[in-house]
Amino acid sequence: MLMISHIHWYERLWPLGSNGTIVQSNVVNNHTYRAGTGSSLVHLINGQAGNIESHSFTGANEPVLNITAVLDQEHFGFSKLTVVNATAAKWEFIRGVDGQVGDELWMIK
């Protein structure tokens, strides 16, 4: 698997196990994952704060990997984590241009 260490995009991956495969049992739906099970990790990558280098893009012949749930290579923005209680947290990607939620993920235990 190719890993890029410095990107300017927002990406949310499906819950991944130690072998790099998606742990389907931890996917409740597109916007809710089970966390804290010990079988997978939640990966949230936000390089969208913005800078003079602009965004990073996948190559024309480089498909988005099946481990990627959401990929935004267009908007700048920031992330907001809200811990609701001991068993639920909400992650939001907020677009800088209009303050709208570009992505949302609930993590439940």
What role is predicted for each listed range?
Residues 92-101:
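Short, solvent-exposed aromatic-acidic interface loops
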